[in-house]
């Protein structure tokens, strides 16, 4: 049994009667990979005497393990050559239309071997881990053909079994229409619905299905067909929605009872109302707006005020958010979206867990949940986002085991 002691525990719990927006002084008992007890005040001497290990985190803050609910983890290559285009004022869609953007990464991902893609993803997961992430969603969508989509999803499965971070796998063939279907989007939609999605489901390679509902990518009508087909096959649903143009993607996500609608920089007031009513989680990606040098951020405060559950994620990908550090999204949420530290922490713990259907097992410090914990070298939650630009993680614990400490990996497979 391991006993954690701290004068700043932010539990992210949603239990009635608990002030979930404040940290408290207390203790956490961990045994067999699970949280056995959470208490306020001093730990009883009986617990201290029974503990095999006592982690004294006084002067530091303990949170639940961070959950990155939106990543494009498995991909080939990088796109630093596009930075000059962005600095020259080229938009995301202009770069995409010129053969760059997603298609650049599709070519690199198709050309890379399974071993190369796996090693690249493992390196990224290690970076995520030392910055506090203990669970991550991972989308395909840089293959767009049967072979490469399956390859990337098989890598997700391998990563989930061979790295401390738990991986939640998402099929996202509807990321773009590939070159071989350039003038035949309808043919590509049929290919996904009739061939790829059934094969992915048969092999058990993805829990969720996602699609990019955007001008010149997939229309609302096309996206709805894809989502209905995915739901009929038994996939849970996610949606890239209202990222650049307000197409009523959020309303579609709510209509389809999707677990999450993601991006949402161009969401309408009606879209916000729809998400609040449906319970669909808004997964917001402030690091993406930052990297794209955009002045437009999703209206996070308004969403929260209207009752939308808001999560925050990195959107880790080579084109619009090349960072594995979820703390970057936290800082951007504070300084660009004006969210409070408690709102931010809930966004990367319990709300993010809801976005990937894991709220019953992770995302908060509660009895019976998985013992995924992060100890931050911060005396309180305000300091955690106030002291920006550094890795504030002191220790990362996964299922009750120490896996990273002071920027170093200490896990053993």
From Swiss-Prot:
Sequence positions that bind Zn(2+): 70, 72, 240, 315
Compartments where found: Cytoplasm
Binding positions for 4-imidazolone-5-propanoate per the UniProt entry: 79, 142, 175, 243, 320
GO terms of biological process kind: L-histidine catabolic process to glutamate and formamide; L-histidine catabolic process to glutamate and formate
Pfam families: Amidohydro_1 (PF01979)
Co-factor binding details: Binds 1 zinc or iron ion per subunit.
Record GO terms (molecular function): imidazolonepropionase activity; iron ion binding; zinc ion binding
Residue numbers binding Fe(3+): 70, 72, 240, 315
Cofactor entry: Zn(2+); Fe(3+)
EC number(s) on file: 3.5.2.7
Keyword Hydrolase: yes
Keywords recorded for this protein, A-Z: Cytoplasm, Histidine metabolism, Hydrolase, Iron, Metal-binding, Zinc
Catalytic activity: 4-imidazolone-5-propanoate + H2O = N-formimidoyl-L-glutamate
HAMAP family cross-referenced by the UniProt entry: HutI (MF_00372)
Free-text function comment from the UniProt entry: Catalyzes the hydrolytic cleavage of the carbon-nitrogen bond in imidazolone-5-propanoate to yield N-formimidoyl-L-glutamate. It is the third step in the universal histidine degradation pathway.
Protein name, UniProt field: Imidazolonepropionase
Organism taxonomic ancestry: Bacteria, Pseudomonadati, Spirochaetota, Spirochaetia, Spirochaetales
């Amino acid at each position: 049994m391991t006993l954690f002691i701290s004068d700043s525990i932010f539990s992210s719990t949603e239990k009635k009667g608990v002030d979930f927006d404040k940290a408290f002084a207390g203790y956490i008992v961990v045994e067999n990979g699970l949280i056995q007890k959470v208490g306020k005040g001093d730990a009883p001497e009986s617990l201290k005497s029974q503990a095999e290990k006592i982690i004294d985190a006084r002067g530091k803050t303990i949170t639940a393990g961070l959950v990155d609910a939106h990543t494009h983890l498995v991909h080939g290559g990088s796109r630093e050559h596009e930075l000059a285009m962005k600095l020259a004022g080229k938009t995301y869609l202009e770069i995409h239309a010129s053969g760059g953007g997603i298609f650049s990464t599709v070519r690199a991902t198709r050309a890379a071997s399974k071993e190369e893609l796996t090693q690249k993803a493992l390196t990224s997961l290690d970076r995520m881990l030392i910055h506090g992430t203990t669970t991550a969603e991972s989308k395909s969508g840089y293959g767009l053909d049967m072979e490469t989509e399956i390859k990337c999803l098989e890598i997700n499965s391998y990563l989930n079994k061979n790295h401390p971070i738990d991986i939640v796998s998402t099929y996202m063939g509807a990321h773009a229409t590939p070159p071989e279907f350039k003038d035949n989007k309808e043919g590509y939609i049929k290919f996904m619905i009739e061939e790829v999605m059934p094969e992915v489901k048969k092999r058990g390679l993805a829990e969720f299905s996602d699609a990019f509902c955007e001008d010149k990518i997939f229309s609302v009508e096309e996206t709805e067909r894809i989502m209905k087909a995915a739901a009929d096959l038994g996939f849970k649903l996610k949606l890239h929605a209202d990222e650049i143009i307000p197409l009523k993607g959020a309303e579609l996500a709510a209509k389809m009872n999707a677990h999450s609608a993601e991006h949402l920089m161009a969401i309408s007031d009606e879209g916000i109302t729809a998400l609040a009513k449906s319970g669909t989680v808004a997964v917001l990606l402030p690091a993406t707006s930052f990297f794209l040098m955009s002045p437009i951020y999703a209206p996070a405060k308004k969403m929260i005020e209207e009752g939308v559950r808001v999560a925050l994620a990195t959107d880790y990908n080579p084109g619009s958010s090349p960072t594995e550090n979820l703390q970057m999204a936290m800082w951007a949420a504070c300084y660009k979206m004006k969210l409070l530290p408690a709102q931010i922490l809930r966004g990367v713990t319990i709300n993010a867990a809801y976005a990937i259907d894991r709220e019953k097992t992770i995302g908060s410090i509660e009895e019976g949940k998985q013992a995924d914990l992060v100890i931050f070298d911060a005396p309180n939650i305000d300091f955690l986002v106030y002291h920006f630009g550094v890795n504030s993680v002191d220790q990362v614990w996964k299922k009750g085991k120490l896996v990273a400490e002071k920027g170093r990996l200490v896990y053993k497979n």
